[in-house]
């Protein structure tokens, strides 16, 4: 058994940091050590910011984004085209699309994808609220922007089935060759999808 080299407070900090996606035990130890070395400049302000976030962060009742206000900043933006809704798996996807800045549409966060093997069914996701949003009217297009995985495609098909008969255009993101990508480095599935989704030039 390894000897303890620090007190329980720092051990707890390391254990909590190790739960952050992308940080394993070693990275968490390095991060914790860096934080405690920079106690005044970094650890204190970080603890304060985290406490503030803990008190103020909410889930948007309209789209599922995280913000300090409800409805969120995105839903409250009157310049957005509310008739176009981009459906994403999680908040990180929403933020990524916003960084791209390609569309000024509304969003809907599902909170994951259907995965019967993991016990995740339609009732575990934010699908009913999406169907209700479309049923209210005023939605012209739904862009399904989920990952190109089996679970993502299953979720896309399920949503399409739920919206059958409603006056809404349903599209999905194009799949294929990334900008700057070289064909030799792409997998067969990506190449096949790119060929099927080819467009005229």
UniProtKB/Swiss-Prot annotation:
Q: Does the keyword Zinc-finger apply?
A: yes
Zn finger (C4-type) location? 60-75
Highest taxon above the source species? Bacteria
Keywords on record:
DNA damage, DNA recombination, DNA repair, Metal-binding, Zinc, Zinc-finger
Query: Which InterPro entries is this protein grouped with?
Result: DNA_Rcmb_RecR (IPR000093), Rcmb_RecR (IPR023627), Rcmb_RecR_Znf (IPR015967), TOPRIM_dom (IPR006171), TOPRIM_RecR (IPR034137)
Q: Tell whether DNA repair is among the UniProt keywords.
A: yes
Q: List the disulfide bonds.
A: none
Matching PROSITE patterns, A to Z?
Answer: RECR, TOPRIM
Task: Show where the Toprim domain sits.
Answer: 83-178
State a single Gene Ontology molecular function.
zinc ion binding
What this chain does, per the record? May play a role in DNA repair. It seems to be involved in an RecBC-independent recombinational process of DNA repair. It may act with RecF and RecO.
Q: Which family does it belong to?
A: Belongs to the RecR family.
Q: What is this protein called?
A: Recombination protein RecR
Organism of provenance: Sinorhizobium medicae (strain WSM419) (Ensifer medicae)
């Amino acid at each position: 058994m390894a000897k303890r080299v620090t007190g329980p407070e720092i051990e707890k900090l390391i254990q909590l940091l190790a739960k952050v996606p992308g940080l394993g035990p070693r990275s968490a130890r390095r991060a914790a050590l860096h934080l405690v070395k920079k106690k005044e400049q970094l650890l204190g302000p970080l603890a304060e910011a985290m406490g503030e976030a803990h008190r103020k962060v909410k889930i948007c009742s309209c789209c599922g984004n995280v913000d300090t206000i409800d409805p969120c900043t995105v839903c409250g933006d009157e310049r957005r085209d509310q008739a176009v809704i981009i459906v994403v798996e999680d908040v990180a996807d929403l933020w990524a699309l916003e960084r791209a800045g390609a569309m000024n549409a509304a969003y809907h966060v599902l909170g994951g994808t259907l995965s019967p093997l993991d016990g995740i069914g339609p009732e575990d996701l934010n699908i009913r609220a999406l169907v209700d949003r479309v049923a209210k009217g005023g939605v012209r297009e739904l862009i399904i922007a989920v990952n190109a995985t089996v679970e993502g495609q299953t979720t896309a098909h399920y949503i399409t089935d739920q919206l059958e008969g409603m006056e809404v255009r349903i599209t999905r993101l194009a799949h294929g060759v990334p900008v700057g990508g070289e064909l030799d480095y792409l997998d067969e599935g990506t190449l096949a999808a790119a060929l099927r989704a080819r467009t005229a030039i």
